[in-house]
């Protein structure tokens, strides 16, 4: 038996069955619209990895709030209008018997000044009153 043979055997994470143990780590591609919509480029990128045999694909950072800036091209899950693109992404990955995992992200204090919509000092007095 090869040293790597287990890599190609089915695996499990909790109740989720995987066709193999090959996992694509989360990475930023910049292939989503600045408003968080999934673009065709991202669908094609993820499909190629699923088609190539990856068992589990992780998305790049996916913002949970529209008003918190992210790098251009990051996906969003903050509004129901984004669901159709997310559904397309899931369907494409599942079509190749792969699974997909969403990486939720909030920039917090790491948000750049250029993209930060709400400054923390604006809420300091609110917090101190509690």
Q: What positions do the PLM features span?
A:
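Hydrophobic faces of well-ordered beta-strands that scaffold small-molecule active sites
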Residues: 22-25, 57-59, 100-104
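Non-globular sequence segments
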Residues: 91-94, 99, 105-121, 125
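N-terminal amphipathic alpha-helix/helix-capping segment at the start of soluble metabolic enzymes
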Residues: 1-26, 93
């Amino acid at each position: 038996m090869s040293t790597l043979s287990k890599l190609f055997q089915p695996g499990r994470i909790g109740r989720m069955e995987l066709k193999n143990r090959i996992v694509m780590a989360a990475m930023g591609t910049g292939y989503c619209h600045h408003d968080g919509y999934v673009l065709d480029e991202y669908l094609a990128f993820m499909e190629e990895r699923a088609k190539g045999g990856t068992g589990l694909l992780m998305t790049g950072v996916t913002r949970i709030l529209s008003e918190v800036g992210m790098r251009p091209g990051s996906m969003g899950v903050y509004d129901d209008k984004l669901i159709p693109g997310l559904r397309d992404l899931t369907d494409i990955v599942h079509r190749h018997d792969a699974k997909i995992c969403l990486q939720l992200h909030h920039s917090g204090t790491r948000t750049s000044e250029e993209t930060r919509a709400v400054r923390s000092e604006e809420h300091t007095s609110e917090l101190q009153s509690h």
